[in-house]
């Protein structure tokens, strides 16, 4: 939650300096800078569960994600972040105070943990992905058609009968459940190409699990967008994924490269972090 983190860091510094915080001490609300690609009239919700550490199979994290479907683009993002952006822009238009925004975001936000918003150009079959971290980056890739194998088996998800399919993508083997009753060849993240909407998909090791938990046809179009960030690195997909691997292996160097100061007593360094992305390669 980018803006929330900014406000909380500001609050922390103000508290340390003066022990008193007033709404006027906070930075003013500014609109979220974004690039809008399309407008969506369909929103599909997916619960996202994943294991941050592949060696700790008992520890899970959970987020609510959404897929937005437009005529020319689809988008996929963390729902808590989208709600925070909407609150920010609404409070900016209404000229409300920064303190009111902080309170509203703290009340409304969920556990936003999906950090790679993306858009897909349907006609060109290209995806632009943004990855947040110590250093934010963005890459654009041509999407190769997934080699789906339609398999025997069926199940019911949200009261809808679904069929089974399998594929290999990003160095993992995946099992998906899709419904031809919803004739949209889309799914969460970059999964697409089946003869119906994907209702659930997970890798065979159950490190990443997406399960549909809602579909809404919107009365008012919703923008499909990514963030404008002048400090964001534009990289190739290969270099972007390499950078995130290196950031997990040596988070202190990543912080120093981002311009953030790190001070430790003695010679201790930040420990490496577990790395278990959706795509391994």
Please annotate each region the language model reported.
Residues 1-30:
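Bacterial Sec-dependent N-terminal signal peptides
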